[in-house]
């Protein structure tokens, strides 16, 4: 797919699977196709997702041969027992070793994903994980509360995460510790050192057009959202035969309002009310008033989640959406 006639590509994100399992040749083929058929900005942010145990000395050397300048690593936790419970292959030691190898390969922008809210996890346990992440001197950190979804193995095992009050304390401890360490809390779950926000993720929250390549990948051109077929065999067959492999919908009316709300309100800058139609702006402010009165939202003049509103953001956004 090419966007050479329309826009420069400002960010590339290779993920949504396990790209660190690919060979040097396979990765080079992907990047060659992107760079040959598209206008890629000279300062593009180019991210690859990796598993810590995949970052061997050889993999780090391979990174040096590619245009990658940012790595996102799923550490999840630095507690080996919890990693085994999550059925992750790596250990806490492998996370540290992987980051060391990436630094030696010249990667100066590393993001780590963490998870909190495990069964029986205490605030002390969580603080140890935060401290371990800070000791690695990464530029970016994302943290998500463990969610045990219906139908998953953990749900079938009748496992439960931490209680809501413990999750709340963990979340605000995370914010306080990272901000004290110089990180900017720029989105509900994302923290960055100065100048190291994820440009790719920020483009989603800003409503910037993007192209998704691969099975189940989504794309957005500013007006229409499309999504590829999720079955990998059907996707490959469609690509090989040159047939349509995606469905689409036009983003307008209430759908456009809901999309803007659910992305912009997650950010530190909040929702620019001037981007709403007059009727949607009136509706939004009317519903938001009780949250403003409760100190969960503020108008600055953008609509912004307060510190107290961050933890209950999902509930607030759901209430503000139009059915």
Question: PLM features: residue spans?
Answer:
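Auxiliary N-terminal substrate/complex-recognition segments of SAM-dependent methyltransferases
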Residues: 147, 285-286, 314
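Short amphipathic alpha-helical interaction segments
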Residues: 277-293
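Hydrophobic residues in beta-strands and at strand termini
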Residues: 50, 305-306
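C-terminal scaffold of the Radical SAM
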Residues: 1-278
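Short, amphipathic alpha-helical interaction segments positioned at domain boundaries
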Residues: 308-323
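Short active-site-adjacent structural elements
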Residues: 272-273, 299, 312-313
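Solvent-exposed, charged/polar functional surfaces in cytosolic regulatory/catalytic domains
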Residues: 33, 177, 290, 294, ...
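A short, conserved structural fragment
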Residues: 292-302
């Amino acid at each position: 797919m090419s966007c050479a006639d329309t826009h420069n590509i400002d960010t590339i994100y290779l993920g949504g699977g396990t790209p660190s399992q690919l060979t040097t040749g396979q990765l080079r083929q992907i990047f060659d196709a992107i760079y040959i058929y598209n206008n890629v900005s000279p300062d593009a942010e180019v991210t690859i997702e990796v598993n810590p145990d995949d970052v061997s000395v050889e993999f780090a050397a391979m990174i040096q041969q590619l245009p990658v300048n940012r790595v996102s690593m799923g550490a999840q936790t630095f507690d080996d027992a919890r990693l085994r419970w999550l059925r992750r292959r790596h250990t806490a030691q492998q996370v540290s070793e992987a980051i060391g190898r990436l630094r030696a390969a010249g990667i100066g922008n590393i993001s780590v994903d963490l998870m909190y809210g495990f069964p029986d996890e205490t605030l002390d346990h969580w603080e140890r994980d935060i401290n371990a992440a800070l000791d690695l001197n990464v530029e970016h950190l994302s943290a998500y509360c463990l969610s045990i979804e219906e139908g998953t193995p953990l749900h079938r095992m009748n496992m439960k995460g931490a209680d809501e009050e413990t999750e709340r304390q963990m979340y605000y401890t995370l914010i306080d510790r990272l901000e004290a360490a110089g990180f900017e809390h720029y989105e509900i779950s994302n923290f960055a050192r100065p100048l190291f926000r994820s440009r790719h993720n920020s483009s989603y929250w800003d409503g910037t057009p993007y192209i998704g390549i691969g099975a189940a990948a989504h794309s957005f051109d500013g007006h229409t959202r499309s999504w590829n077929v999720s079955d990998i065999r059907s996707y490959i067959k469609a690509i090989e035969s040159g047939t349509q492999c995606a469905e689409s919908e036009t983003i307008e009316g209430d759908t456009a309002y809901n999309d803007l709300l659910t992305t912009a309100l997650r950010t530190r800058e909040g929702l620019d009310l001037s981007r709403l139609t007059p009727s949607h702006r009136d509706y939004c402010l009317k519903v938001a008033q009780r949250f403003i009165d409760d100190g969960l939202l503020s108008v600055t003049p953008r609509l912004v989640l307060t510190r107290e509103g961050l933890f209950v953001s999902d509930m607030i956004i759901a209430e503000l959406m139009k059915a």
